[in-house]
Amino acid sequence: MNRIGILSRSDGSSEWKQGSARVICGVNGPIDVKIRDERLNKATVEVLVQPVSGVAETLEKMISSRIVGILEDAIFLNTYPRTLIQVSIQIIEEDGTDTLAAVINGAVLALLDAGISLKYIPCAINCHWKNKITQDEPDVDGTINKLESIITICYSISSEPAKLIFLETAGPIPEEDFFRVLETAPLHAEEVSKKMKELLFETYNESDGHENEKNPKEDVEMDVVA
């Protein structure tokens, strides 16, 4: 289940499930920043990603670097000069295919819960493309070989039409199918944005003591198979 405001020691927090991935995100800030990291006219954004078990390694550091760039562009950094906005992300479940999109959306929800001002809402989706010609050919060890391309796409959602801000692919995909994915992806990203807004509205309505008149919250399915 997708939730916000779940961590009592964070200014904002979220639990977000997307496909095979589930993450818990916490935001603290704006808080004091170390002098060496201080930026005179804007905030510093720090993202820490922890794996399901063990310590952060290359993959988690790679995810962190990607998330920092996305969040720095979305946040009104000049509103919080000489401060730190710290985003901590714990991966609870994953199989490596949906993690990046889940982390992006979970972090954005936690920022919104913390009241951080955003220029727009970044919304990420995953597209899984399978090579239909070879997907049933067994590997040498007898397992089924399913060649798959995983495409993570992030759009900025605001009053303007959705704008592509991030795209990453893992694995080959024919050009025709790739552009077909790009044609439909903005609609799915806008659906993610709608689900986020509904979750925020429902949660704060409940916290104010108002009866929730909407349907029960459901996990958001954002995988688009092209």
From Swiss-Prot:
<dbReference type="GO" id="GO:0071042">
    <property type="term" value="P:nuclear polyadenylation-dependent mRNA catabolic process"/>
</dbReference>
<keyword id="KW-0694">RNA-binding</keyword>
<dbReference type="GO" id="GO:0005730">
    <property type="term" value="C:nucleolus"/>
</dbReference>
<comment type="subunit">
    <text>Component of the RNA exosome complex. Specifically part of the catalytically inactive RNA exosome core complex (Exo-9) which may associate with the catalytic subunits rrp6 and dis3 in cytoplasmic- and nuclear-specific RNA exosome complex forms. Exo-9 is formed by a hexameric base ring of RNase PH domain-containing subunits and a cap ring consisting of csl4, rrp4 and rrp40.</text>
</comment>
<dbReference type="GO" id="GO:0003723">
    <property type="term" value="F:RNA binding"/>
</dbReference>
<dbReference type="GO" id="GO:0016075">
    <property type="term" value="P:rRNA catabolic process"/>
</dbReference>
<protein>
    <recommendedName>
        <fullName>Exosome complex component rrp46</fullName>
    </recommendedName>
</protein>
<dbReference type="GO" id="GO:0000177">
    <property type="term" value="C:cytoplasmic exosome (RNase complex)"/>
</dbReference>
<keyword id="KW-0698">rRNA processing</keyword>
<dbReference type="InterPro" id="IPR020568">
    <property type="entry name" value="Ribosomal_Su5_D2-typ_SF"/>
</dbReference>
<dbReference type="InterPro" id="IPR001247">
    <property type="entry name" value="ExoRNase_PH_dom1"/>
</dbReference>
<dbReference type="GO" id="GO:0070481">
    <property type="term" value="P:nuclear-transcribed mRNA catabolic process, non-stop decay"/>
</dbReference>
<dbReference type="GO" id="GO:0070651">
    <property type="term" value="P:nonfunctional rRNA decay"/>
</dbReference>
<dbReference type="GO" id="GO:0000176">
    <property type="term" value="C:nuclear exosome (RNase complex)"/>
</dbReference>
<dbReference type="GO" id="GO:0000175">
    <property type="term" value="F:3'-5'-RNA exonuclease activity"/>
</dbReference>
<dbReference type="GO" id="GO:0000467">
    <property type="term" value="P:exonucleolytic trimming to generate mature 3'-end of 5.8S rRNA from tricistronic rRNA transcript (SSU-rRNA, 5.8S rRNA, LSU-rRNA)"/>
</dbReference>
<dbReference type="GO" id="GO:0005829">
    <property type="term" value="C:cytosol"/>
</dbReference>
<dbReference type="GO" id="GO:0034475">
    <property type="term" value="P:U4 snRNA 3'-end processing"/>
</dbReference>
<keyword id="KW-0963">Cytoplasm</keyword>
<keyword id="KW-0539">Nucleus</keyword>
<dbReference type="GO" id="GO:0071028">
    <property type="term" value="P:nuclear mRNA surveillance"/>
</dbReference>
<comment type="similarity">
    <text>Belongs to the RNase PH family.</text>
</comment>
<dbReference type="GO" id="GO:0070478">
    <property type="term" value="P:nuclear-transcribed mRNA catabolic process, 3'-5' exonucleolytic nonsense-mediated decay"/>
</dbReference>
<dbReference type="GO" id="GO:0071038">
    <property type="term" value="P:TRAMP-dependent tRNA surveillance pathway"/>
</dbReference>
<comment type="function">
    <text>Non-catalytic component of the RNA exosome complex which has 3'-&gt;5' exoribonuclease activity and participates in a multitude of cellular RNA processing and degradation events. In the nucleus, the RNA exosome complex is involved in proper maturation of stable RNA species such as rRNA, snRNA and snoRNA, in the elimination of RNA processing by-products and non-coding 'pervasive' transcripts, such as antisense RNA species and cryptic unstable transcripts (CUTs), and of mRNAs with processing defects, thereby limiting or excluding their export to the cytoplasm.</text>
</comment>
<dbReference type="InterPro" id="IPR027408">
    <property type="entry name" value="PNPase/RNase_PH_dom_sf"/>
</dbReference>
<feature type="region of interest" description="Disordered">
    <location>
        <begin position="205"/>
        <end position="226"/>
    </location>
</feature>
<dbReference type="GO" id="GO:0071051">
    <property type="term" value="P:poly(A)-dependent snoRNA 3'-end processing"/>
</dbReference>
<dbReference type="GO" id="GO:0071035">
    <property type="term" value="P:nuclear polyadenylation-dependent rRNA catabolic process"/>
</dbReference>
<dbReference type="GO" id="GO:0005634">
    <property type="term" value="C:nucleus"/>
</dbReference>
<dbReference type="GO" id="GO:0000178">
    <property type="term" value="C:exosome (RNase complex)"/>
</dbReference>
<keyword id="KW-0271">Exosome</keyword>
<dbReference type="Pfam" id="PF01138">
    <property type="entry name" value="RNase_PH"/>
</dbReference>
<dbReference type="InterPro" id="IPR050080">
    <property type="entry name" value="RNase_PH"/>
</dbReference>
<feature type="compositionally biased region" description="Basic and acidic residues">
    <location>
        <begin position="207"/>
        <end position="219"/>
    </location>
</feature>
